[in-house]
């Protein structure tokens, strides 16, 4: 575990900057600030986003680990500056403040600086205030905010580059449903469809369900409410054998589920047909196999979503995540004032009506990071070229292993071919 791909983030929602750290990437990956900015812009997409998306910009700086557009093999650090920081320098100051100063006292007593003692139901406010012994929610909500996912998206840009350069695969997502909208039930999109998906106001693959999603958001906004939904992440072209069956924490499905559940507001994850599988009989639940004429295996279905026994099986990886409605509800919910114990309504700051389209981009990020870690664990490599050589050697082995011709099987079994033991 010590030398596996690792990532972490630091920073608060209204702090000076967010920081993303990625360790144990191979040298030679091609990643630019423009690549990171592009993914961050995708994270801001979607009908139903709040005003904050309009005036906040993501200022990307590579602090370390990259030179001339290539990773060095050392830890990578990315900083995403907060363009609104001048408005928050006192309230979010890392240094002690002098509240005897009239100007400081005024700023801390009203507006942005006022103590937030009314925790929002569904948010981290209440449990965090009790656990960390804070007298207000500001120290909790600043870190628990989904703004933190911007730093994850930055890290995920490097994971995407690894998957692209080493395996030639891409990660994409689309929105299945929002609220009670008609769900999408068609085939999975191809990566070539991504531009069209991102052009959709709700990141829908099918225009037929797009209108239903938009109507849901309009209705929620009109009634002062918020909405959740379901996103699907799709990855095609993964090799057989990423992950492992040998222990629970090495199962790729467990890692994917944990990574997706770690996204703010995600309350459920399913792989493949997921919960629908529980309603089927065994004879209808599993993906039967046939030997393909040109070698390899052909599946008659992909209900497993590309994972069996904690490992990729060569089929399309398909993972869904369910996002609950945003906790900051304009029509404020009942709560208790933690300063007095009196009945109150939850604090309300600017928020989105629906962030499901953006959640899809964050879900892509987490899937990419988990897959990149699995790739490096299986194939290793201090440089991209070394990792590619290792991948190529393995793929050649798989092709030979699944070549059903009699001669190939004889060679694989160590029998004589052309007068030699191979």
UniProtKB/Swiss-Prot annotation:
Cofactor(s) listed in the protein's UniProt record: FMNH2
Record's keyword annotation contains Lyase: yes
Entry's cofactor comment: Reduced FMN (FMNH(2)).
Pathway: Metabolic intermediate biosynthesis; chorismate biosynthesis; chorismate from D-erythrose 4-phosphate and phosphoenolpyruvate: step 7/7
Binding site for FMN: 143-145, 264-265, 309, 324-328, 350
EC number: 4.2.3.5
GO cellular component, one term: cytosol
Family stated for the protein in its record: Belongs to the chorismate synthase family.
Name of the molecule in the record: Chorismate synthase
Protein source organism: Corynebacterium jeikeium (strain K411)
Lineage: Bacteria, Bacillati, Actinomycetota, Actinomycetes, Mycobacteriales
């Amino acid at each position: 575990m010590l030398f596996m791909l690792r990532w972490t983030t630091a920073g608060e929602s209204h702090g000076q900057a967010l920081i993303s750290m990625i360790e144990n990437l191979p040298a030679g990956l091609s990643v630019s600030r423009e690549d990171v900015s592009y993914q961050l812009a995708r994270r801001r997409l979607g009908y139903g986003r709040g005003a904050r998306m309009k005036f906040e910009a993501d200022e990307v700086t590579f602090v370390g680990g990259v030179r001339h557009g290539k990773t060095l093999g050392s830890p990578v650090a990315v900083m995403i500056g907060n363009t609104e920081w001048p408005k928050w320098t006192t309230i979010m100051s890392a240094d002690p403040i002098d509240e005897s100063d009239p100007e400081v006292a005024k700023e801390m007593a009203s507006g942005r600086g006022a103590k937030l003692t009314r925790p929002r139901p569904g948010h981290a406010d209440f449990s965090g205030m009790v656990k960390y012994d804070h007298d207000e929610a500001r120290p909790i909500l600043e870190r628990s905010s989904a703004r933190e996912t911007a730093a994850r998206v930055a890290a995920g840009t490097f994971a995407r580059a690894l998957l692209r350069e080493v395996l030639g695969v891409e990660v994409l997502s689309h929105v299945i449903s929002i609220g009670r909208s008609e769900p999408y039930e068609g085939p999975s999109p191809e990566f070539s469809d991504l531009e069209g998906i991102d052009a959709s106001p709700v990141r829908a693959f099918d225009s037929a369900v797009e209108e239903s999603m938009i109507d849901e958001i309009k209705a929620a906004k009109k009634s002062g409410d918020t909405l959740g939904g379901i996103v699907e992440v799709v990855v095609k072209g993964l090799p057989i054998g990423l992950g492992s069956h040998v222990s629970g924490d090495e199962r790729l499905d467990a890692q994917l589920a944990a990574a997706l559940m770690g996204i703010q507001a995600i309350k459920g994850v399913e792989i493949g047909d997921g919960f629908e599988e529980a309603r089927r009989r065994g004879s209808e639940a599993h993906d039967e196999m046939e030997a393909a004429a040109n070698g390899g295996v052909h599946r008659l279905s992909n209900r497993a979503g590309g994972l069996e026994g904690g490992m990729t099986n060569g089929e399309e990886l398909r993972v869904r995540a369910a996002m609950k409605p945003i906790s900051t509800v304009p029509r404020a919910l009942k709560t208790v004032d933690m300063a007095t114990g009196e009945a109150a309504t939850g604090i309300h700051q600017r928020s989105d009506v629906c962030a499901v389209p953006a959640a899809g981009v964050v879900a892509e990020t987490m899937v990419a990071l988990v897959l990149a870690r699995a790739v490096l664990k299986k194939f290793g490599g201090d440089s991209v070229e070394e990792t590619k050589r290792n991948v190529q050697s393995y793929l050649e082995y798989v092709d030979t292993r699944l070549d059903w011709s009699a001669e190939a099987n004889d060679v694989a079994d160590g029998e004589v071919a052309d007068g030699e033991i191979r």
